[in-house]
């Protein structure tokens, strides 16, 4: 696998592949990779001739008092895992390469509406940072297809909307959430959990599953939500949000809506865990 921090190196290699009529897939990451990321790379390798990955801990998407400095950097292990999964080109830029004028002077991309709710409300500016870095990476790599995990459901919709609104010629594919045996969604932030917290963490998935089951049985959204919040609190969580939304627009769920998604974010110790479940009523 070729690894470079420089934009020109990435563009030169991708141009060489394109000159031969070959297709390019892209998997952007922040590193500290787990099996969910590796699954994205393997799926990408099935779809395209070449897979490009990136590792960049993006300062623009972290708010004040968030874990930018603490976020684990594990480049050597990540590089080995990406190579084994089939990636051929790895982009590892520094913040100075991505934002040479600094964050305050950086042109940014903002996806209105869908970026302002749920995680966007809890983490102001987060999705501006996500949309900006993903747009920049798309312009650098210029892939045919890009792969993202469904665990970050709102992020996936923000990126799909950006691609559609800006007429970017890139197919976006979401891959099902990869889970540990306990049901806990794999996340780079699971490493913040103590052993006791990790034992309690599957309660988040159980609460979401119970909500969906209740809604399918005709129980009101309000009732299932209150019961789920109570179960999470009893398990040691501090819920951030727990909501039922229209699966495609993230508008608040209406009685007539069939395609729904439950989205949850909750703190467990130092970790902020997110999860979701899309289902039809």
Curated annotation (Swiss-Prot):
Keyword entries, A-Z: ATP-binding, Cytoplasm, Ligase, Nucleotide-binding, Pantothenate biosynthesis
Family statement drawn from the similarity comment of this UniProt entry: Belongs to the pantothenate synthetase family.
Subunit annotation: Homodimer.
Pathway note: Cofactor biosynthesis; (R)-pantothenate biosynthesis; (R)-pantothenate from (R)-pantoate and beta-alanine: step 1/1
An example Gene Ontology molecular-function term: pantoate-beta-alanine ligase activity
Any Pfam family hit: Pantoate_ligase
Gene: panC
Binding site for (R)-pantoate: 61, 155
Protein residues bound to beta-alanine: 61
Cystine pairs: none
The protein's name in its UniProt record: Pantothenate synthetase
Catalysed reactions, as listed in the record: (R)-pantoate + beta-alanine + ATP = (R)-pantothenate + AMP + diphosphate + H(+)
Described purpose of this protein according to its UniProt entry: Catalyzes the condensation of pantoate with beta-alanine in an ATP-dependent reaction via a pantoyl-adenylate intermediate.
EC number: 6.3.2.1
HAMAP family, per the entry: PanC
Active site: 37 (proton donor)
